[in-house]
Amino acid sequence: MLVKRIRAVLPGICIAMLASVSHAQTSYSTDWLANTFGTLSTHVGNGARSLWVAPEGVIYTASRWDENAGGVAIYQNGQTLGTIGIHDEFQGGAITGNATSLFVALGYNRTFGSGSVGRYNRGTNQRDLRIPVSTWTGIQYADVITGLATGGNLLYVSDFYGNRVRVYTTDGVWQRDIGVAGPGALALDASGNLWVARQSAGVVAQFSPAGAAMSTIQMAAGARPASLYFDAPNGRLLVGDEGPDMNIKMYTLAGQPTQVGTFGVQGGYLDTTSGIKGQVGDKRFTRVAGIGKDAAGNLYVLNNAWGGGWDLGRNGSTDLHAYGPTGALQWKLQALNFEAIAAPDPVTDGTLFYSGNNVYTGTAGGTFVANTVDPFTYPKDPRLDMNDYQRGQHFGQLAMVGGNRILVASGQNPGNFNFYHFNSASGYIAIPDGSIPGKPFNTNLQVTAGFAIDDNGDVWAGLDRTNTISHYPMTGFDATGKPSWGKPAQIQIPRTVLPLTRIIYQADSDTMILAQGISGSWDWTAMNGHIEVYHGWKGGNTSAPNPVIDLTSANPKSIAAAGHYLFVGYVHTVPNIDVYDLNTGNLVTTLTNSNTSAMDVGNDVDSMYGVRAYLRSTGEYVITKDNYNGSSIVVYRWHP
């Protein structure tokens, strides 16, 4: 009866009422991936790069940056207990403690620079002392303090650029220096001897309490000792190896140090005898950044997944494993997505999600499936470039062509995009194929007027200051699965949408979506809210958009499309995703948070490609959104 009445009214009113009914009847769920916990108060902290474990099993980790919490996170029994400090207070590379205090490498500060250690009262969580350690006070983007250890009333500090380990009282009074080239992680054995990891040399060196050189552990070629822990009950030194073995090596210290065992799969996540190459999980470690044990004999291993540049708040991710005394996995705490996004995977109909570096699946935090970076086979992978101006390639876009995945990885507000393919021999590892700008596309111009890869694998790019869209047709795959593209067609950008800032092309419906930037603005990444939809673009319609969508909400930042819907995220305003009909231009619904008791959805989307969308074969739309506050990915599942 209601439908008949709607049909009876004037056409204009009819459209409005139908839109209203559609808005009211849409349903969606709100979920998250890439963090063990969904709320800001409980979320696992971003980018933990070192850890210290108290005897009672309280775990402290240090991070360079956590957007919405203190940089030292506190955990116990798989739960979040709180944080210490502010979001950027710490460097992240070193932490230790004793019964009363924590000692943490401080981040670069405009007042005192780099190279200091802060002492924090474990009862109050407040800093009560700063110890200036290094004369290298101008290093903003690298670790100056690379190791910390305490023994009795002494504090040992690795001054990396000073090529020394400095010894202080725990009250900050200098005692002596021990000369060591490039010192890193530290540990003290039962006799008070100091063990110093020299990561790049593959050496762990022993010094007496007075600083005299003693034994040396020369590890195998390629080994990289990144973390140390002395296991007193067993008299063993545990060494976290970030070289190709990616495991923990155990040394007995009676007499000449001798390796007596390992913990973790040899080859870590790249091993193919116990899993798929790239697959993470129980004892399939990535970078072993921290090791600790509690009085009950539980072992804690902090992993950092591979990928990231000079921004140490985005290089690696928190992947903390707890193992019982028998070596059985007890729990994991993970924070894997900061200023990043994972796209639903067409090959698995949206079951898997690929970010620039990782693969996820599941619900309610999900499962960390794989790290797609192989630093040993592909050391020049752009996702490992410490000089990358984008601070990492964490944002993923995906295309499926004939069953072949193409991954495009980029930064937060990118001018260049990196391409990867997959094959069965490499498992989950993404194989680098080049970039735009770069050789595969025969251009050195940055992409400043929009980028898209469509379902045919074609690339559409608005190259800097050309006022054209370059359309690179995909020409196929070679025998290894590597894609290639042909010479571009140059298409004049419609004047009504200049300056252009976003491009989406839907190959199945021949629909082009163009979003306008802000004329005269210094911020070429910004959108002004004017979006033109061209149906039949390849068929010749490059001048008559219909519909034209002028957004009413301020500061749109990221758009994605699937089916006949457009999804819009905003910056500095609301966390919502608005959904528009690409046929009518009408606002259909707004996705907010239907799961407030279990999760937060962040503040906004402050990245150009921080929203992805996919239409599943079931008719369900899967929309992902970056939540940098919670170091997670928001996942909407929408049923129109």
Task: For each feature predicted by the language model, list its residue ranges.
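Repeated scaffold domains used in trafficking and secretory/extracellular systems
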Residues: 47-50, 89-96, 142-148, 182-188, ...
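Conserved beta-propeller blade signature
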Residues: 58-60, 102-104, 155-157, 193-196, ...
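A short loop-to-beta-strand structural motif that recurs across blades of beta-propeller domains
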Residues: 70-73, 115-118, 164-166, 202-205, ...
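Short loop/turn segments that connect beta-strands within beta-propeller blades
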Residues: 75-79, 121-125, 168-173, 207-212, ...
